[in-house]
């Protein structure tokens, strides 16, 4: 449960016991619940921030500490890729708590890249509409693609290509790839 910091600490402890040569992380867990600025609750905001921001921050720090503690060579394969959302560049008022948490994740990506270099590269991918939102019908899903500047949206294959690029581009850190 990523809203329970004790569970997150236990996850990190168990991981470090089993994987001393841990060098990479993709932060893909996420909570995506609808609310607006007029109706958000502190409980919903805290859940979004815990899952979409605080837990990834803890995991990134744990990975960095593992690299240093185990004197893992400062190679460019030590990396984090955060999955955020293209909403960070195309704000709209829906999914208020979710959007705030992804904006925080964007800042986390840049701050972590600065804080953990040169031992750890930290980048992010910000996909747009790839999958339908909960309760979104097929027609509305297809219409939403047309709101993109290219009149289409990213695909799962685009996401894989971005992951491959960031994984293998050893000179890139602090970058957010918008899809």
What residues fall within each predicted segment?
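Rossmann-fold cofactor-recognition segment
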Residues: 1-4
